[in-house]
Amino acid sequence: MVTWDIEVTDTFGGQANYDWVNRYETTTADDISDLALVRRIKSVTGYSGIRGRTYVSGDFVEIRFPACCVVIFANVRC
């Protein structure tokens, strides 16, 4: 099992602004696919069903929603 720390924050000029931030955590299986992981993260944060740009790099996930000026960062907890 893997625990993910998730941060949702606003953007300003395309960069994370941290004017406000919401933090979550979720636990997933070790062998979860990238698609299933992104769906889980979006579901936990309340952004499921909204299209965004996703970048997955091993133990880091970034999901950007340019229309909403929001970004989600997810990191594996060590």
Task: List each language-model region with its residue ranges.
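Short aromatic-glycine-(Arg/Gly/Cys) micro-motifs in beta-strand/loop hairpins
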Residues: 1-21
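Hydrophobic beta-strand residues in large extracellular and virion-surface proteins
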Residues: 4-6, 37, 41, 63
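Generic structural motif
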Residues: 9-11, 29-31, 68
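Generic low-polarity alpha-helical segments
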Residues: 14-15, 25, 61-63
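A short, exposed loop/beta-hairpin motif centered on an aromatic-Gly-Thr core
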Residues: 18-32
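General helical secondary-structure elements
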Residues: 19, 35-38, 47-49, 60
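Polar, enzyme-active/binding microenvironments
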Residues: 29-32, 38, 43-44, 73-76
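Short, mixed-charge low-complexity intrinsically disordered segments
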Residues: 44-78
